[in-house]
UniProtKB/Swiss-Prot annotation:
Its EC number is 2.8.1.8. It catalyses: [[Fe-S] cluster scaffold protein carrying a second [4Fe-4S](2+) cluster] + N(6)-octanoyl-L-lysyl-[protein] + 2 oxidized [2Fe-2S]-[ferredoxin] + 2 S-adenosyl-L-methionine + 4 H(+) = [[Fe-S] cluster scaffold protein] + N(6)-[(R)-dihydrolipoyl]-L-lysyl-[protein] + 4 Fe(3+) + 2 hydrogen sulfide + 2 5'-deoxyadenosine + 2 L-methionine + 2 reduced [2Fe-2S]-[ferredoxin]. [4Fe-4S] cluster 1 binds at C109, C114, C120, S356. It comes from Medicago truncatula (Barrel medic). This is Lipoyl synthase, mitochondrial. The gene is LIP1.
């Protein structure tokens, strides 16, 4: 059985805290525009050529190339060179930021201090400009140990004009793909699902061609809420499981759990119209093992999830959960290739990848366009 092989491979892919020498000759998930696969056929062909063998994983282990050590107060160490952030810029970045301030809108890009903000907002190498808008306010009712968003048991009520303001702003920006996410709103009777649905529907009316990913909270597993958002007209239903099953209680708020999140993703696949993609994401460097990661991938794929992303956890402040280790680009690429072999339609995996990373959205856009072209011919 193929999954048994994945688990055998994972046991040979050991985590380590010993530093190793990283050079630019190492293969990473970042490529130049000339090397970037331009469609899914090219991507799958490249993955087939570069499919990892058992010896690749054993090599990572023996060369201490799975992860590097995190510094401490007594033994400070610099971040690995691959974790250095780029400075945001570009005219489209400036335009979007100005409009956000005028309309008092929030983006998770800014709230979470995402390192890819400039690339995503400006279009980057692929030309697919994206942004991640956060609705339902900027204060969450939950307190996950990794998250930098403000928290409160009683946040201010949602702005009734927000769906209209968000839709009009996004429609004016010339974006190809937008991610709409929200804080958790356990204080609301419907967990904010109606507000989410209204925002998606109004944006689709103003700009039917835009692709919308809704990155939603778990709605406490409420099927009615999940169904409402799944049928709102979105193109991608995303909900993040955040970490492996074994670390859920240590990383996420006590009201969240692995099985509830998987149920949300399963329900979305059942409720959403045919052709709607489902997506999830996990952070690495929280103390998980390779074997736990592979087992989690198996369960996520069994839930029918189409797209999965992997990124390095970065500690927002000293009051947040510490980073356990920095996973290397080589290890991230192995997870990407294993994910494609498992049957995910796309896997974005790299140290700087976030759940709404635009390189992934470029391929998701290609998948949606391809699926719709086939559907229109049948």
């Amino acid at each position: 059985m193929m999954y048994s092989r994945f688990r055998t491979v994972a046991k040979n892919l050991k985590s380590t805290t010993k530093p190793f020498s990283f050079t630019t000759a190492t293969t990473t998930t970042t490529v130049s525009s000339s090397e970037f696969p331009q469609n899914l056929t090219e991507l799958r062909a490249r993955l087939a050529r570069e499919s990892p063998s058992l010896s690749d994983f054993i090599s990572l282990k023996s060369n201490n190339a799975y992860s590097v050590e995190v510094g401490t107060k007594k033994n400070p160490l610099p971040k690995p060179k691959w974790m250095k952030e780029s400075i945001p810029g570009g005219w489209k970045y400036v335009q979007i930021k100005k409009k956000l301030r005028e309309l008092k809108l929030h983006t998770v890009c800014e709230e979470a201090k995402c390192p890819n903000m400039g690339e995503c907002w400006s279009g980057g190498e692929t030309g697919t400009a994206t942004a991640t808008i956060m609705i339902l306010g900027d204060t969450c009712t939950r307190g996950c140990r990794f998250c930098n968003v403000k928290t409160s048991r009683t946040p201010p009520p949602p702005d009734p004009d927000e769906p209209t303001n968000v839709a009009e702003a996004i429609a004016s920006w010339g974006l190809d793909y937008v991610v709409i996410t929200s804080v958790g709103r356990d204080d609301l009777p419907d967990q904010g699902s109606s507000h989410f649905t209204e925002t998606v529907q109004k944006l689709k009316i103003l700009k039917p061609s835009i692709l919308i990913e809704a990155l939603v909270p778990d709605f406490r597993g409420n099927a009615e809420c999940v169904e409402k958002v799944s049928k709102s007209g979105l193109d991608v239903f995303a909900h993040n499981i955040e970490t492996v099953e074994e670390l859920q209680s240590a990383v996420r708020d006590h009201r969240a759990n692995f099985n509830q999140s998987l149920d949300v993703l399963r329900m979305a696949k059942d409720y959403a119209p045919a052709g709607t993609l489902t997506k999830t994401s996990i952070m690495l460097g929280c103390g998980e093992t390779p074997d736990q990661i592979v087992k989690t991938m198996e369960k996520v794929r069994a839930a029918g999830v189409d797209v999965m992303t992997f990124g390095q956890y970065m500690r927002p402040s000293k009051r947040h959960m510490p980073v356990s280790e920095y996973i290397t680009p080589e290890a991230f690429e192995k997870y990407q290739t294993l994910g494609m072999e498992m049957g995910f339609r796309y896997v974005a995996s790299g140290p700087m990848v976030r759940s709404s990373y635009k390189a992934g959205e470029f391929y998701i856009k290609s998948m949606i366009d391809s699926d719709r072209a086939v559907s229109s011919q049948s």
